[in-house]
């Protein structure tokens, strides 16, 4: 166990991509040079005023940032505890937080002379966000998606195709996000000269976990400023769903040194942690190596990856970003979980109390906020990251509830 004060958060990752014992680079030799090229380009352009100005312009005028903070007064009143606020990432162009990252990585790809971008996707939001920026920049786009997710996220598959992307359904393994990521990595190994891999979460080999975090940290920077303007102080607690964990790290990172602000990451408990049918490696997993980095994983006794389950395609992943693993071990963040049933209940409660239809991923965060807020006094503030909108999930929910559309 790492003590909370041993490592300062802004010193991480180190030059080799480590967050304490997590992260790093565990890839085939053929990918070492492309990763070094990417790291050098990222560090160069992160200090380039022209790149940063273009990024800011696109976030403001294309994505629609800053996303607003919304005080859910009716919901807060009905719960009878802390005041609940939402960071409205669902209002971004494409409907989720994913576009914050794809805009940044696509601009990098353009400057690095790449003509083709590839991506993996689970819920389809990262695929849509990648296809969107590829269309805008005139780049070829290929998206890998597990065959199970292709079925349950048919709307987003059609959106990607409308945007000009080629969507490849992956039939291997559990046919979900893990397998899509495997195939995307294979594509990149084969086509490194002209292809840029836009990873959608804070996982993968260094520099991806840090780079995706830095592009998503606009969420937390804005939220920090907005909460100070609206309430005169910082929130008492942050709540965000965690699959790979990019929306959560995006919110958490600018608050890490504010020790008075509690941080809660909400994993997908699926049918219940005790059933084994879940996607909660921080709650019930152990450290191992997957997709180029060391982190908490869902493994069996032989070190084989266990098949995951969640009603939410975007949380249906057996690993988690290495920075979350470090935040768990050092005690700075707490990781909890919500079941499919709890997420569905939260989906309906938020929809009917505030007129906001959240994504099933975001509904896991809402579910925990519904538990947390009543335990706190009315002068406390809970800020929930509403990472995406729920249009994409309507058919999944209708089918589960026996409704034919």
From Swiss-Prot:
Pathway given in the UniProt record: Amino-acid biosynthesis; L-tryptophan biosynthesis; L-tryptophan from chorismate: step 5/5
Cellular component aspect of the GO annotation: cytoplasm
Source organism superkingdom = Bacteria
What's the EC number here?
4.2.1.20
Spell out the family assignment given in the record's similarity comment.
Answer: Belongs to the TrpB family.
Concerning PANTHER family, the annotation shows: TRYPTOPHAN SYNTHASE (PTHR48077:SF3), TRYPTOPHAN SYNTHASE-RELATED (PTHR48077)
Q: Summarize subunit and interaction data from the UniProt record for this chain.
A: Tetramer of two alpha and two beta chains.
Q: Know the name of this protein?
A: Tryptophan synthase beta chain
Please report the organism this UniProt entry assigns to the protein. Methylococcus capsulatus (strain ATCC 33009 / NCIMB 11132 / Bath)
Which lineage ranks, top first, belong to the organism behind this chain? Bacteria, Pseudomonadati, Pseudomonadota, Gammaproteobacteria, Methylococcales
Gene symbol of the encoding locus: trpB
